[in-house]
Amino acid sequence: MMMMMMRSTCNLTLMLCICALVVASMAAEGPRDFKVGDEFGWRVPLQNDSAVYSHWASSNRFHIGDSLSFVYDKDSVMEVDKWGFYHCNGSDPITAFDNGNSTFDLDRPGLFYFISGSNQHCTSGQRLIVEVMHIHQHHDHDASMPPSMSPLSNSASPYASASASSAASSLPTACLLIPLFLTIASFRFISY
């Protein structure tokens, strides 16, 4: 009976160690290239899905050093200012691409606004706001960097963001301590 409990505890400890390694490797992730819209790509949304790009952006986290890949056919993509975004006005773009496979480097924190070069496509929902957070942080939390807001929000609480950031940065540490705690607890249980 005692041997079976020891084996079970060892298996659990091994599984938790593997979990900790996976979580730690995810925390050390470097710059990424995001294909805008995933498999949908950069095209006019379906009639009942004009928020497809808002949903896509809110399901991703963008950092300085990441890039966006726009894949499209017979269209274009423009980076515009906030006014150009909300009015689907591409008359004075910051950057414009029309080669069908365009990559845009996210080189600063803050909001980036993208629209289709076709006014009709833009008003049908082919536009995107991306919020870029600071550089990918590996293990140390830089207290000099202000917390980022969540995607597409204009007024996130800095306290909520700071606590979420600190909770996320302590996750790998917690995962590493769990197997140690279980091992110690199992030896204490076995010795009685």
Curated annotation (Swiss-Prot):
Tissue specificity as recorded in UniProt: Mostly expressed in flowers, and, to a lower extent, in seeds, but barely in seedlings, stems, leaves and roots.
Top-level taxon of origin: Eukaryota
InterPro entries linked to this entry: Cupredoxin, ENL_dom, Phytocyanin-like, Phytocyanin_dom
Segments forming domain Phytocyanin: 32-134
Propeptide: 167-192
GO CC terms, sorted: plasma membrane; side of membrane
Record keywords, A-Z: Cell membrane, Disulfide bond, Glycoprotein, GPI-anchor, Lipoprotein, Membrane, Signal
Protein name: Early nodulin-like protein 7
